[in-house]
């Protein structure tokens, strides 16, 4: 089996700790976020959410990027983007759709994709796979 290289799409309060945990366990980890400001903060070992300490960021070996093409180096992709709900309690899946579209552009045979974001049953089959 090839070496596992993990990408985390979405570096918020869920994605960043997940990326750090994989990195601590010696997995090559790529952290991706569409927010360039967020990526620049993380490159300086700063987490404004307070979820991960500066010390833990300094010890981690994560490649932070805002270029989705960098995800092509990974073979195990985890999507951790927000899924806010509107005033009618309907989830906004636009960030899931965007993440799936970007990963779909670089996906290789035998790659694995996991949606860690909060979604209702059927989202993978109905929304993610067709993209």
Regions found by a protein language model. Give the residues of each.
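Short helix-loop-beta connector
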Residues: 1-2, 108
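Glycine-rich Rossmann-fold phosphate-binding loop(s) that bind the pyrophosphate
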Residues: 11-12
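Rossmann-like NAD(P)(H) cofactor-binding subdomain of soluble oxidoreductases
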Residues: 85-131
């Amino acid at each position: 089996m090839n070496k596992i290289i993990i990408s985390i799409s979405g570096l918020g309060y869920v994605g960043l700790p997940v990326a750090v945990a994989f990195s601590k366990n010696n997995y090559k980890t790529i952290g991706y976020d569409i927010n360039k400001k967020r990526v620049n903060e993380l490159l300086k070992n700063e987490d404004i959410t307070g979820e991960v300490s500066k010390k833990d960021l300094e010890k981690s070996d994560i490649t932070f990027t805002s270029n989705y093409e960098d995800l092509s180096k990974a073979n195990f992709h985890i999507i951790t983007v927000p899924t806010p709900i509107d005033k009618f309690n309907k989830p906004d899946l636009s960030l899931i759709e965007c993440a799936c579209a970007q990963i779909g552009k670089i996906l290789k045979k035998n790659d694995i994709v996991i949606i860690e974001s909060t979604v209702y049953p059927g989202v993978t089959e109905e929304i993610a796979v067709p993209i």
